Amino acid sequence: MDLKAQVQGFMAKKEVQLSDELAEKYGVPPEEVAGVVNSFLKDTYGPAIRLAQDIDGKVGVVLLFIGRKDCNICRRSEPILESFLSCHKDLELVKLDYSQSSGLLYHMIHGRENGMLPLIAFIFQGAIRMIFTGECLHAAIYEKYYNECSQNIYVH
């Protein structure tokens, strides 16, 4: 799954959805509200888009962790994640708080309006190799996904 394509697809879908909703609400053609919608989307999702572009340009494997400070599941997952990362210095951690504007990357990657936190993704050269959401209480789970991700990386 290509990160850049996911972001572009999400933004295109949002643009159509919001344009249609506003057009229906105000009884105007969608083209008439396109400028307002584009401005809103740029302001709202801009930080997440820029972050996705940064991640896309990275050479090594990125482990993306999107959680929330007040999420107990996220907090329980963090020490396990840190332990896993201490054994895998080749990974670059990108840790986001879902409540921040860059945390909207969650929806761009996950593709749904709602879901479970945290979201954990292994991304290599702009390709999302593995993604999972929810509680992760064992380093073996990270290890499993890391190994699958590594196999996929070296095959391509």
PLM region spans:
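Generic alpha-helical secondary structure signal
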Residues: 31, 79, 139-143
